[in-house]
Amino acid sequence: KRLIPVTDILALAAADLVIEAASERLEVKKALFAQRAEFCPPQTLLTTNTSSISITAIAAEIKNPERVAGLHFFNPAPVMKLLEVVSGLATAAEVVEQLCELTLSWGKQPVRCHSTPGFIVNRVARPYYSEAWRALEEQVAAPEVIDAALRDGAGFPMGPLELTDLIGQ
């Protein structure tokens, strides 16, 4: 009810929190954050839903980089409780604390981490995705069987092939 999707970036000027979910390209994100930093008040928290791009790099050239952090949601976002709260080198500790409190109020389970390739989950889970694709290439099983095995046998909410197809990897 309190989330308002916008297509006009100027509509964000009054927001307390902005969550960017643009394509996974550093230059796109840097341009969006530079725009936001110009017209959002200094207390507005600027976050990105990136799954792997450096928070430090995104915040490097903007005003008040201490207010920039990552909020990495997992697919399917309405179902998955885990949410990585990612800090860059300039991110203020109080910003991370505010974001953790906020995400708890959304019914999410925040985990704090520093900006590093893949953060926590993707860094550790990438071998699952790679091995699923390798198994498919080697014709170990059909794609739907591989996905079902990981969903049903390992408790994955989505199979690794299904997920990488959804997120475009």
Please report, for each region that a protein language model flagged, where it lies by residue:
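Hydrophobic/aromatic beta-strand patches that form the interior of the parallel beta-sheet core
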Residues: I4, I19, A69-L71, V111
